[in-house]
Structure formats: structure tokens, C-alpha cells
Amino acid sequence: MPKLPAILLILSTFVTIPCVHASPVFPFSLGIRDSIMIAHSFKGEQFGPAQNVHGATYTVDVTFRSKALVPKCNWVVDIGEASTALGRILSKYNFKNLDEVFPEGENTTTEFMCKAIHGDLAKFFCTDRAKTGGGERFKGSICVKLWESHKAWACYEANV
């Protein structure tokens, strides 16, 4: 049997690696990215110095997952529409003190913010968009990941 060139051996290893975001339930995915800068403080001794007002810059990754592509378009969701919607949603939080955006005493942890942004996206893609005739209701899963740094992140994912 002839030996394969080293580059082909390396490439063949990558070909067999499945998509990290793929799942048997939702084999298709589309991801978008944006960022926000916020200030906030936490309530409770367990938060130590983070009880004081401090800032954070989040990288925001959103992944839309679906069982099938939208007929005729062959996409999970319109990437331009998704990017615009995410930008509008994030503008509610960007350059804001979250202590003034959410009810008093709400700990706006990274996990909490993932769920809040997810709720805003779900409302847009599953309710508002369909009501305005902007498109069909999105069917699938939305995953919101906020990166605090290259070392720490949080996610919230749910079917919509």
C-alpha cells in the first residue's frame, strides 16, 4: 500500500471531526457576533469586590440552530436580519449601567444577561417578526454566549 503524503494524513483527520455545534436534533446552525460594554454591581457578600460598580466588555455570540433550512432561501435565518436584530437588542444594554436598566437588586451576572438577550431575540424572531410580516416564525434553538474574556464565558440555550 502506498504511503500518503503527510498533508493528506493531516487533512483526513480534520475531515472526520464533526461540527462542534451540530446535533442530531438541530444539524444546521448560523452564528453571529457583536459586543457590548456595560457597568453593573452585584448584591451579596458572595460577590466580594464585585459589589462595587465595575465595568465589563462582552463579546456576544449568538447561534441559531434548526432542523432544516428555510425552503427556497437555503438558510437557517437571514444573517443580515439576525445581525441587525442583535444590534438593536444590544443597544438597550450597551454603554449602560445595568443597575439602572433592571429592577433594583437584580444581579446582572453573565448568565443572567445571556438569558435576557435570549428572551429578546426569541421575542423578535418568534413573535414580533411574524406579526409585522417580516418573515416566518423561527423554529429551532437559539444559543447566546457572552464572553467575559478569553478565559471565561456563560451560555443560555433554549428551543423557541
Residue spans of the language-model regions?
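Classical eukaryotic N-terminal signal peptides for Sec-dependent ER targeting/secretion
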Residues: 1-8
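Charge-rich, low-complexity N-terminal segments
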Residues: 8-160
